[in-house]
Amino acid sequence: MGQTVTTPLSLTLGHWKDVERIAHNQSVDVKKRRWVTFCSAEWPTFNVGWPRDGTFNRDLITQVKIKVFSPGPHGHPDQVPYIVTWEALAFDPPPWVKPFVHPKPPPPLPPSAPSLPLEPPRSTPPRSSLYPALTPSLGAKPKPQVLSDSGGPLIDLLTEDPPPYRDPRPPPSDRDGNGGEATPAGEAPDPSPMASRLRGRREPPVADSTTSQAFPLRAGGNGQLQYWPFSSSDLYNWKNNNPSFSEDPGKLTALIESVLITHQPTWDDCQQLLGTLLTGEEKQRVLLEARKAVRGDDGRPTQLPNEVDAAFPLERPDWDYTTQAGRNHLVHYRQLLLAGLQNAGRSPTNLAKVKGITQGPNESPSAFLERLKEAYRRYTPYDPEDPGQETNVSMSFIWQSAPDIGRKLERLEDLKNKTLGDLVREAEKIFNKRETPEEREERIRRETEEKEERRRTEDEQKEKERDRRRHREMSKLLATVVSGQKQDRQGGERRRSQLDRDQCAYCKEKGHWAKDCPKKPRGPRGPRPQTSLLTLDD
């Protein structure tokens, strides 16, 4: 029976949830398919000895990291999250990685026992400390000092000879207690953890700090201007916490502008910044717009290749920032780069997009105005802060506000003389007087009850009216029937012929009256027939 071989790559795939969690702690995201591709196909081609099955060897991880973070076209920005996660697994290993980490630092000894001298550091492959590395601290080693802005002088960046690489393992804090020497107190610590991008001489190394910061150009101890390059955490926090240039060019342009002002980056730093925050197509568009902004000696835009290349070169120039001329070139380059960002971020005029910005149901007028102004900046060539555009912005603010606010703003007296600030204040008053959701629910409930009560009352009144009308009609019908019978009876009597003065009403003969009529029968009178009446039941 064969036995399954566990490799670093298969180990990470088997604990992929932990790998994703560690990557998230590094503010990056990793995908399993690309993780396998980079480990087994990409990094072995860097010629640093990376095995296809992966490794937790810190020296090899450091060498791959140098290749990945190389500035310019030789770097691999898309692989940064993956090598940073590999580095975190090796330098701060979880329990399932610790048995595979090699070489493993020596365990710390109790402070009371004399420590054995450590073996001299081996010659190791180059290691860049451009970015922070998480290393287990020794028990007796004090916390490394974080350099302040007034730290020791940095070394010249523009020379081409690389410095000797330091040993990746942290040196011991002191020598053997039986005669070993402690580190001299007067020795200055290494002024920068960014070893791969500094050139020239180096001070004696100390343990790396677990944090790194990017500083602007500053004067060192000898008065020479030096700088600290960007850190990976800064670059990728900027990338992950801001929208893309295509999605919101204004916000990303403002971020890059603040970085250009505070950090005063060199030409190489600008390329690294653009390569991290922009896509390839966005970067080419920005560079093209920046070169269009180059002006000639007459102050007008020029298209002369020599003047454009001198002001905004596409290849690394030989500008020495320690000289006034070099600093002037860098300042002009940053100004052109900012102009390129602003011009490339402008979208074609689209007033329909501006008209599509309407106030939300619970959005304050101030927030709505900011969105409206941002739409003007993004979709039109007009500046909403320009006094000449205040009328257009005011009309858009009125027409595109919430219906209740817009109606009241349109009825304001002397509307044409109102400024945009006046309209916003009036809109805020209307917005603040709106009923709360609880008040609205109570009003709707009360109106519903009142409506039901009115409908019930109206139904009762209609029913009573129908009953009265029915009784009235039946009464009329009954009265008509009774009146008809009476008229028939009375009418029959009235149809008798008129008698003379001496004529008998019974026999119609003259000479006597009916009471004396001999032809009239004598005797008791019979019962009179009763008249039938029509009742409501009939």
From Swiss-Prot:
Modification sites for Phosphoserine: 192
InterPro entries linked: G_retro_matrix, G_retro_matrix_sf, Gag_p12, Gag_P30, Retrov_capsid_N, Retroviral_Gag-Pol_poly, Retrovr_matrix, Znf_CCHC
Region called Interaction with host PIAS4, residue ranges: 345-393
Gene3D superfamilies documented for this protein: Gamma-retroviral matrix domain, Human Immunodeficiency Virus Type 1 Capsid Protein, Zinc finger, CCHC-type
Chain ranges of zinc fingers (CCHC-type): 502-519
Chain ranges for the short sequence motif PPXY motif as given in the UniProt record: 162-165
A Gene Ontology molecular function term of the record: structural constituent of virion
Coiled-coil regions listed: 438-478
Effect of residue 137 to A: No effect on reverse transcription activity
Posttranslational modification: RNA-binding phosphoprotein p12 is phosphorylated on serine residues.
LYPX(n)L motif (motif): residue ranges: 130-134
Pfam families linked: Gag_MA (PF01140), Gag_p12 (PF01141), Gag_p30 (PF02093), zf-CCHC (PF00098)
Protein species of origin: Moloney murine leukemia virus (isolate Shinnick) (MoMLV)
Positions marked as site (Cleavage): 131-132, 215-216, 478-479
Residue ranges, compositional bias (Basic and acidic residues): 163-178, 434-466, 486-519
GO cellular component entries: host cell late endosome membrane; host cell plasma membrane; host cell uropod; host multivesicular body; membrane; viral nucleocapsid
Protein name: Gag polyprotein
Lipid-carrying residues in chain (N-myristoyl glycine): 2
